[in-house]
A protein has these predicted regions:
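Bacterial N-terminal signal peptides that target proteins for export
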Residues: 2-12
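C-terminal motif of bacterial Sec signal peptides marking the signal peptidase cleavage site
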Residues: 21-24
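Conserved functional acidic sites
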Residues: 28-248
Length: 248
């Protein structure tokens, strides 16, 4: 539930980083001198470990060690259950100490995926996504690790999963590993009211997650400032939804 962008401005480094983050937007393109067609600017965020803090306390994406979020929902494949646990583990990525979040999914009671995601927050309050180690299962056996990636390895680059000061219309890269992981996010609204099994939440942030390489990814996510995390995921088209049922 990667719950899976445009906000830095206090120094020259941060201003440059902002341009990198926005490289997926129309303002981040340039003309190809030979063809005359727009050419997407290179995405290359500059990461300085000194710009990061130890605590992740963004109001929409708060990762306190020990917290556990449980989600359930109906998908085209059946009933899904997801457990997201903020561990007390850390991983060093590009010199940054990232918090390890374990995301485990079951379909019709059978384990289908076990993932460790790596997140870190910068001084401005942006939450960065530095990669994941994922395993897909069939009949309790690992059948694939496709989708695993680590920022700084094989030209993979981190992205922002939650900006410090989200604004409607912001568009940002959540991850970048060319041809493997290229999820994007758009800020749709800041004032949504959402009702799920766990309760009713107001002033939720709504995002649209999509991918340039994975056309099946097209979903809305709703983040509650009261919970500090995702409370609902649902397909942009269709009836599939996965919602928060418990917080421990």
């Amino acid at each position: 539930m990667k719950a899976k962008n445009a906000v830095k401005a206090s120094t020259v480094l941060i201003a440059f980083l902002l341009l990198s983050i926005l490289s997926g937007c129309s303002g981040g393109t340039k003309k190809n001198s030979e063809s005359g067609k727009p050419k997407e600017a290179e995405y290359n965020p500059k990461i300085d470990p000194k710009d990061f803090v130890s605590k992740i306390d963004n109001k929409y994406f708060t990762l306190a060690p020990g917290r556990k979020f449980i989600y359930e929902g109906k998908t085209s494949a059946g009933t899904e259950r997801i457990e997201v646990i903020v561990t007390d583990e850390s991983k060093r990525v590009m010199g940054v100490t990232a918090t390890v979040v374990r995301d485990t999914a079951w379909l019709e009671g059978e384990l289908i995926e076990d993932t460790k995601d790596w997140f870190a927050q910068d001084k401005e309050g942006n939450v960065w996504y530095f990669g994941e180690e994922t395993k897909e299962y069939e009949k309790n056996k690992v059948v694939s690790t496709k989708g695993s990636w680590e920022a700084g390895v094989d030209d993979a680059k981190p992205g922002i999963v939650m900006p410090a000061s989200p604004k409607v219309g912001d568009s940002y890269r959540q991850e970048y590993f060319k041809g493997e992981a290229e999820d994007m996010g758009d800020i749709v609204a800041l004032d949504r009211k959402v009702t799920v099994k766990y309760g009713t939440f107001e002033n939720c942030l709504q995002t649209r997650d999509w991918s340039k390489i994975e056309k099946s990814l097209n979903e809305y996510k709703y983040y509650s400032p009261d919970i500090g995390f995702v409370v609902l995921e649902k397909a942009v088209k269709g009836k599939e939804r996965v919602e928060l049922v418990s917080v421990e």
